[in-house]
Swiss-Prot record:
Organism: Homo sapiens
Protein name as catalogued: Deleted in lung and esophageal cancer protein 1
Annotated compartments: Cytoplasm
Compositionally biased region (Basic residues): 1-12
Phylogenetic placement of the source organism: Eukaryota, Metazoa, Chordata, Craniata, Vertebrata
Major subcellular location class: cytoplasm
Keywords associated with the record: Cytoplasm, Differentiation, Spermatogenesis, Tumor suppressor
One term of GO molecular function: tubulin binding
Disease note: DLEC1 silencing due to promoter methylation and aberrant transcription are implicated in the development of different cancers, including esophageal (ESCR), renal and lung cancers (LNCR).
Amino acid sequence: METRSSKTRRSLASRTNECQGTMWAPTSPPAGSSSPSQPTWKSSLYSSLAYSEAFHYSFAARPRRLTQLALAQRPEPQLLRLRPSSLRTQDISHLLTGVFRNLYSAEVIGDEVSASLIKARGSENERHEEFVDQLQQIRELYKQRLDEFEMLERHITQAQARAIAENERVMSQAGVQDLESLVRLPPVKSVSRWCIDSELLRKHHLISPEDYYTDTVPFHSAPKGISLPGCSKLTFSCEKRSVQKKELNKKLEDSCRKKLAEFEDELDHTVDSLTWNLTPKAKERTREPLKKASQPRNKNWMNHLRVPQRELDRLLLARMESRNHFLKNPRFFPPNTRYGGKSLVFPPKKPAPIGEFQSTEPEQSCADTPVFLAKPPIGFFTDYEIGPVYEMVIALQNTTTTSRYLRVLPPSTPYFALGLGMFPGKGGMVAPGMTCQYIVQFFPDCLGDFDDFILVETQSAHTLLIPLQARRPPPVLTLSPVLDCGYCLIGGVKMTRFICKNVGFSVGRFCIMPKTSWPPLSFKAIATVGFVEQPPFGILPSVFELAPGHAILVEVLFSPKSLGKAEQTFIIMCDNCQIKELVTIGIGQLIALDLIYISGEKSQPDPGELTDLTAQHFIRFEPENLRSTARKQLIIRNATHVELAFYWQIMKPNLQPLMPGETFSMDSIKCYPDKETAFSIMPRKGVLSPHTDHEFILSFSPHELRDFHSVLQMVLEEVPEPVSSEAESLGHSSYSVDDVIVLEIEVKGSVEPFQVLLEPYALIIPGENYIGINVKKAFKMWNNSKSPIRYLWGKISDCHIIEVEPGTGVIEPSEVGDFELNFTGGVPGPTSQDLLCEIEDSPSPVVLHIEAVFKGPALIINVSALQFGLLRLGQKATNSIQIRNVSQLPATWRMKESPVSLQERPEDVSPFDIEPSSGQLHSLGECRVDITLEALHCQHLETVLELEVENGAWSYLPVYAEVQKPHVYLQSSQVEVRNLYLGVPTKTTITLINGTLLPTQFHWGKLLGHQAEFCMVTVSPKHGLLGPSEECQLKLELTAHTQEELTHLALPCHVSGMKKPLVLGISGKPQGLQVAITISKESSDCSTEQWPGHPKELRLDFGSAVPLRTRVTRQLILTNRSPIRTRFSLKFEYFGSPQNSLSKKTSLPNMPPALLKTVRMQEHLAKREQLDFMESMLSHGKGAAFFPHFSQGMLGPYQQLCIDITGCANMWGEYWDNLICTVGDLLPEVIPVHMAAVGCPISSLRTTSYTIDQAQKEPAMRFGTQVSGGDTVTRTLRLNNSSPCDIRLDWETYVPEDKEDRLVELLVFYGPPFPLRDQAGNELVCPDTPEGGCLLWSPGPSSSSEFSHETDSSVEGSSSASNRVAQKLISVILQAHEGVPSGHLYCISPKQVVVPAGGSSTIYISFTPMVLSPEILHKVECTGYALGFMSLDSKVEREIPGKRHRLQDFAVGPLKLDLHSYVRPAQLSVELDYGGSMEFQCQASDLIPEQPCSGVLSELVTTHHLKLTNTTEIPHYFRLMVSRPFSVSQDGASQDHRAPGPGQKQECEEETASADKQLVLQAQENMLVNVSFSLSLELLSYQKLPADQTLPGVDIQQSASGEREMVFTQNLLLEYTNQTTQVVPLRAVVAVPELQLSTSWVDFGTCFVSQQRVREVYLMNLSGCRSYWTMLMGQQEPAKAAVAFRVSPNSGLLEARSANAPPTSIALQVFFTARSSELYESTMVVEGVLGEKSCTLRLRGQGSYDERYMLPHQP
């Protein structure tokens, strides 16, 4: 159906154009390939498996998958059609079927079916024939209607074309040629109604032009000639120079015809499937009429024959032809010949009519008639993915009436494949109208476009070309090819976002990479998740996927490093192998700001004026007043194209005087904010727009009266720091931003106060004015300021009324204001007032000073003061005064005493009587006033009388009077005499005072009281005269002769004029002798004070832990608290020392005097003197001694005497004594003395080496460093006993142990812990004796708990034989845990030793080194200690009751000896000379000599050197042992002593016995040992052993690259004489060859007999070792004498593989020659001489006598 085909083509063309309009810009694929070969990502595949009848005819046929091998069979007829799945289809058959079920069937008989039924008619079935007749009629009617439809459509199209041509012609005639482009002429009247056949339209029931044109057809006269307007006519010159448009059009038409003819010729010689899709009529329109060679040009002869003759001739010709006419087989004729068959596509040509008129339609060339027609004409694949295989069926239909053969050539590219054809019959022949089908397979490896073709060769001369195309709608991105990032500061980062949207019809994945990386070696290496960088640009994301209609933001980071434009090119690649360039551009800029304008006059600093060191600009404001504001306009230009965020900060200036040419240092620049500045700038912060001028207002608003000086700094926020080229080259660049000061403006401004001047500045009202009268005064105020002032006058209305008019207002600059002062006096007298005028915004007001004098009534008194003199008590006195009015105003007055004076006395009633007390005086009048005073109290009267005048000035009259009586008194009536001692006179002072102004006599009487006889009192002076208000000091001396308290003593004093005498009481307590005995608190634990009569506990304690042979001094203080002189004496009862201890002087050594004066000798002599002093003190042999430095003397009055008392001991124990102190007649004082001495009197040091005042620690016994398991080392130690007692030592050795779970030890003993033993160590039992014998053990109560079955008896007084302490049978001791007893490491002998008093004994300490484990490589510290528990065998030495007590055994601190040593393993220092380890690197190919023909070496020895060094101080004895394949030698002799191993025990014993040589290495010496490794073929054979049979120390390792190594590990043993060993690891790595074939089998396929075929196989060496290989041929099947397979070469040498290089290889040529038509199989094995793993190659080949398997160009 032509109409249907045309519609299909139109829809296809429109869709194809739409896809091409929106396709992503592709790039040309690489030369030599028809499709991209780069790997791409998978894209979504939209394909359908549904097929319909239109599959064979539709251009856009859907492909199918490989799993569907055949076309779906036609389903059974259905009543209803299903709705199509595609939303774009226009098929409405399902709707018609549902509505018109009876008229519209589901199945339609197509063109091919109906044509086949009509051609195949002739059936014997009448019904079928009737059906075919009806079908033929229907088809003819259908074609007739289609022809009519096409005729109507063609007629309408031609009519429209003619109307358009006529319109254009008319418009071109009416248009003006030179104004053609400027003037738009109106359209002409349409002529389409005259070009169309209205009757034809009405016949087919269509709308005609008469249906919508209502006007009648006008009558037109004959056409006139064309008349052009004058403006359109050409001038003479223009006509000469111009070319006629008709000529141009003619030339253009001629050229177009030539090109069209050439194009049609090309089309005539090109035959493909696209050409035959066109209808025959359409093609006939494009072709020129063909001329037949058989027809003569002169046809007039046909008109000369008569009709009967012509019919007769034709009849004869028909008879002649019927004899030779027979049906020929058109198969054997070419399809383009006469008998080659007719075309089923093109109708047969019509015979030309006879006559002058012939058909002008073009005829179809028989040579161009197609034989086969492809359906579809183009193999088109869409919506494919990577991986699946797609199929489509191409049907080739025979379009001729003859059965034809064909041959199809497959596609040339690997992406398309052609399956075997499916023919309708056997033999590969296609009947007329029948089709053969070929399955085309599509294997896409990417999502790009693919093009190929299939060639169909037939008997025709032209080949049918079927294009194969794969097109996937590409994604289309809206991303611009140029990404402009704009401007950015150098060192900064600017991010620009671009919207990237996929407006295509498929999903796409995209990858962005630098252009320099294109093409990449691997997409995985460049497909990063983050930014893709190409400095100074970075793009994110670098990999993204976009679905259709989706968008993503592409972020471009621009970080310029240099100034100017930066441009980089990126490649964005799609997964359909299409790429596109993206150009990123940006411009890097630096900050550039300019201050281009400052309003006002230009400011310059004055000469010598200090300015800011860093400011670029200077602005000075004119002096301004307070609270005023001055402004300046600043214009700052941002010269960059980048927005700059800024803010202003106001800082204090950096002022520093500089000499000419001197520069400042940056250290002197300080930045302090100016918080009290008067400057401000607006805006304070904001953003500077790119390349724009910005206006700022600088304001100066002073708020204080001073000069302001500040610096305005413009700070740009977050300005990036440019990276230097050095830092960028070193890779230290980092993005950092900071605020930068880019502009500094120094501003200055001064402030001046408001210049306000009052004229006059003070108003002085002359004369005196009476009160109540208003006084007016005028004045002026000038404003000399630079700004207007606003004033406000104050008011005064408290006493006077003062006002100014006007009170408020404004005075302009340099103007004056007139004011008037109103002053009304309210109080008489002069007044001075300051009237304030407040000036707005002025810190201080303007003051108008006013002075005036007002007066009222004035009264005066004739006297200045009133004196009454001295009065006696009860006396009255009267005085008179005169009051006179001196003013012209009447005055009302009143006089009284001042209330203030009454309150001061205090009195309620005034003693004055005033007559008259009040009255009124007329002007200039006078009156008398009498004032009377009555003396009622003794007092000194000073008061004031007030004269009150109404509205006038008051007057004051002072009054004086003195009223007294006689009075004398003592300052203190009781005297207590302190510090009164028996018989000692004591003086004190008393005071006698005269309380009046009258002179008075006094005298003292006798002492009164019942104790007056025991006392004597003397007063000096005894009598005298006291003047007015006199104080007299008297001396009183009292002597008491009794110690009773004085309480009843009185001394009288008689005074003239007083009725009773004065009495002085005397008291006091006489005291006796008082001496205080104290012990210094600083040196005694218990310090108390003893007072006579108040007994308290007093104790002299020298301490509870006094070290032996250490002086301890305490101070006894005697204080005489009375003025009585007395004697004293000190004495110890038992442990006293001789008094001549201090008198003994140490003899000086015999040496020069100069040497004796040195500091060292002086210290030595001082120590020796102290030792001699202690030896003298302890000479009595009691173990302890106490010595007072002053034993007796005189104690003066109030004297404090400090007496040093020294205590020391040379034997441990607790000592008690009494110190008897006797003072004068006081009772002797007994002071208990206590001292506990601790320490050990036994030491290994000499006595002279003891230190003073501190304990001496025993030096540690060091045994040095010993070898593990060595011999015992013994040290001798001499112990000295400095005590006066024999001391027994029982030794125990311990090892320290620090365990958190063991803190204390509980020791239980039965009997004494350390009994006496004989020399053999047996315990001795002997009776208790006080002096010597068996020891009675008594541990201290502080460290042990004792349990006994007997009751302890108390010991009182001295020791006696009857009071024996019962022996304790069981003792329990609890002590801190420090160590565990150990006797195997350290040992002391003898275990029990007695050191005599003042003598010495010798002990022996031995150390046995322990045996260390082999894991210990370093020396081990062995610490221990020995405790010598001290015991006293003499009971007297142990205890004297009440005097001393000495503990023993565990109760006393033992003698501790620290023992220290080191044990180190027998180990030598090993130094290796090969890479720091004893490792042998060998290759198995080392056994192959340079000439392989000479054979393979049996053994190869490699030697390394080992240096053994003895770094200790002791010699080492050792042997060297090692197993094969390693060996050792020293001094040329080989030693391969083997350690026992599997199968080598006997050999090891033999070699050890034969070479049992012990080596010795002295201290600090070294030895060189040779260690060898033997490589042999025997070792290489181990690699073939199974894994379970691999020998110990042998390991086979193979890397991922195929390299194979044998690793041998052994230990070199150094066996020392102490049965310890030292291990030196040995390792040998042998690289063995690893061969591999490139393939494991070779199949030659089917070959012609006796024809040799060759295949190449590569033999590769994967290891770093050479390989000598040979090829062995296996058994051949079938086994015949003639060998079918052979290899060349069959042996050779493969070099080692280099590091990081591909394996070395050699090409092996495998030859196969078939001897018969049989199947040949064989096996070849590649063997190596070094034990390599063999490689097997299986060979296979088939012989055949078929010549089609014969290779050309071979015999």
